[in-house]
A protein has these predicted regions:
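Membrane-interface transmembrane helices that cradle and orient dolichyl/undecaprenyl
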Residues: 129-164, 190-194, 359, 407-412
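Transmembrane-helix signature of polytopic, membrane-embedded enzymes
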Residues: 79-105, 123-124, 150, 362-367
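Membrane-proximal stem/loop segments at transmembrane-domain junctions that anchor or position
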Residues: 231-317
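Extracytoplasmic catalytic/substrate-binding loops of multi-pass membrane glycan-assembly enzymes
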Residues: 11-24, 35, 40-55, 61-65, ...
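Transmembrane-helix motifs of polytopic, lipid-linked glycan transferases
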Residues: 69-90, 128, 132, 346-353
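Specific aromatic-rich, kink-prone transmembrane helix
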Residues: 81-85, 102, 121-140, 164, ...
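Short helix- or helix-capping micro-motifs
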Residues: 1, 99-107, 111, 131, ...
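Short acidic/glycine- and proline-prone juxtamembrane loop motifs at membrane-interface regions
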Residues: 114-121
């Protein structure tokens, strides 16, 4: 289905705006064996997806059709992962299969894995992290209930799964740095009352170890290469500027697709001018510093916010609406807007019903924390509908499918 969607738009024609940054990073990896200092004028993209393109295409990332094929393959992993997590949560094969099918055909998942964009890889990594952490806690609970040799095997399996969960979250963060905000949730097993304190601590510690071991090599590489602390990339400044500068309210007020390109060009020119006013121009030591470029753009955006308190309040309201609204953008046309609105309103209702009736209350609280943290982080930085999808839509499906079944059956 994902390949069919990619073919419909043209296998050799990328549609996503940042595709060239990803491909150029992968190209430089293949050509020199090193990652470029910048993949755009302002920053270097998080390395996860470019590394994946370089490896999965066997060194041919300039082949856009092949890029789309390997992205579709990565995105397709979301469906079985959702089914696996659903089975662990609800113990029903029918619900798990239905959830997997829903994940395979959900338009947002299909769309984002049919082009050259990082969501195709980010979504399965994020799901893998959540599913592995869930299974690690379940194995620890089995250990609590077991005795003898079987208990020891459960402990070992639980620790291995926890390390893998932490590593998967680190790889997700190396693909989309916003996932760093979810790192504290690796400590969630500490609150699992099914387990004794010692197994809880082991699972939580193992997940943190896996996260650190997977993230540290890249962070150390950045420290050695730039002489600066950059956990993943220096893209925060440019993204924060987009979401908080004087341009942000204008962007969220756009109603016509034809206005987007001129607005982006004008905003790019403004960013360049603001950096130049501070002496940050290509060829200077100041510009070569990722942190200086990033912090300069953050400070510029904060100055805009301080100069316009009323606009800041309006911007926050617009961000909340753009995050929660049940359709992506009016640019897609009213038939899509109306159908997406009907679908997502129904999915919201079904997911709420599923959460209220779910027996595993700890898992519900964990998912609510993911919803809240992901929303808060993006409200502070930049809100786009495609940023919400990998964080919210899997949870909406996981609880929406059993919730819809309960709504269909009616009250017990």
């Amino acid at each position: 289905m994902r390949l069919a969607a990619a073919s419909a738009a043209g296998l050799a024609t990328p549609r996503f705006g940042d595709w060239d940054a990803f491909v150029s990073g992968a190209r430089e990896l293949v050509r020199t064996g090193t990652y470029p200092d910048r993949t755009t004028y302002f920053f270097f993209e998080a390395p996860g997806y470019p590394f994946y393109l370089a490896a999965a295409t066997l060194g041919h990332p300039d082949d856009i059709a092949l890029d789309k094929a390997v992205s579709a393959a990565a995105g397709a992993a979301a469906a079985p992962l959702l089914a696996w997590i659903s089975l662990a949560l609800f113990g029903s094969r029918r619900v798990a299969i239905a959830t997997g099918v829903a994940g395979a055909i959900l338009p947002s998942f299909v769309l984002f894995s049919s082009d050259v964009q990082s969501e195709a890889l980010f979504l399965p990594l994020l799901l893998a992290a959540g599913g592995l952490l869930l299974r690690a806690s379940d194995r620890a609970a089995e250990r609590t209930a077991a005795k003898g040799r079987s208990a020891g095997l459960a402990v070992g399996a639980g620790a291995f799964l926890a390390v893998a969960a932490g590593a998967a979250l680190a790889f997700a963060a190396l693909t989309r740095p916003s996932a760093l905000a979810l790192a504290p949730l690796l400590l969630a097993p500490l609150a699992d009352r099914r387990n004794a304190p010692a197994p809880r601590r082991r699972v939580a510690a193992a997940s943190v170890i896996g996260f650190v071991l997977a993230l540290a090599p890249w962070t150390i590489r950045n420290a050695l290469h730039f002489g600066e602390l950059l956990p993943v990339s220096d893209g925060l400044g440019a993204t924060f500027f987009d979401g908080n500068s004087a341009w942000a309210n204008r962007i969220y007020a756009l109603k016509d697709r034809s206005e987007v390109a001129p607005m982006n060009a004008a905003m790019h020119a403004d960013r360049v001018a603001r950096l130049a006013a501070l002496g940050l121009v290509p060829g200077t030591d100041a510009f070569r510093s990722p942190s200086r470029r990033s912090w300069a753009l953050i400070h510029a955006a904060l100055e805009d916010r301080r100069a316009d308190p009323a606009g800041t309040r309006l911007l926050l309201l617009r961000k909340v609406w753009h995050w929660l609204r049940p359709y992506p953008t009016p640019f897609w046309g009213w038939p899509i807007v109306v159908s997406a609105t009907v679908f997502y309103l129904a999915l919201y209702a079904a997911a709420a019903r599923g959460m209220m009736s779910a027996e595993r209350r700890g898992a519900v609280r964990f998912c609510l924390a993911v919803l809240a943290i992901s929303m808060a982080v993006h409200l502070a930085i930049l809100v786009l509908w495609r940023y919400r999808v990998p964080y919210w839509d899997p949870i909406l499906l996981l609880y929406g499918v059993p919730g819809a079944a309960r709504l269909h059956r009616g009250p017990a």
